[in-house]
Amino acid sequence: MKKSHLFLIIVAVLIIGWFFVRFLFGGNEDSWIKDSRGVWVKHGNPSETPDSVNEQQVAILCAENLYESFTILTVEISSQCLGTCGDYAIDIVHAPRTEEDNLIENQCEDYRSGNVSHFIELDKEGNVVRIV
């Protein structure tokens, strides 16, 4: 057998082996992943929704409702804490974020004191900037 044929067979076996290992151990393509803002989004068509994803989705809806209630009351929205939704503090920040947003005194008291574990940052228009 020629060396070139042997080389091609070895390359073909390696490629087939790589695909086998990739699909056998590569993990589930249908899952949930976090986008750049920290929001859980579907990746493919996951069969189940984890509790942490449901909790975050409920908190985002609650945050949107809090924001709407402040705007209906014609309260001027600036850099302030709107309240809490479950285990999330809801905070208004600049978009894009500034150093002022990182100051500890500008974070929600419930988050600073440990009453909640996460926070949702909204911009002045009510859009999610970041979730931690």
Question: PLM ranges: what are they?
Answer:
Residues G27-D30, V75-S113, H118:
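Exposed beta-strand-loop-beta-strand "reactive/processing" segments of non-cytosolic proteins
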Residues G27-N28, S36, N45-S79:
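Short, non-transmembrane alpha-helical segments in secretory-pathway proteins
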Residues M1, L24-F25:
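Short, aromatic- and cysteine-enriched interfacial helices/patches
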Residues M1-A12:
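N-terminal Sec-pathway targeting helices
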Residues I9-V11, G17, N106:
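Low-complexity, intrinsically disordered/propeptide-like segments
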Residues L14-L24:
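Hydrophobic alpha-helical membrane-insertion segments, chiefly the h-region
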Residues F7-I9, D30, Q57:
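Alpha-helical interaction segments
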Residues N28-I33, G38-E48, Q107-V132:
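A short, surface-exposed interaction/processing loop segment used at functional sites
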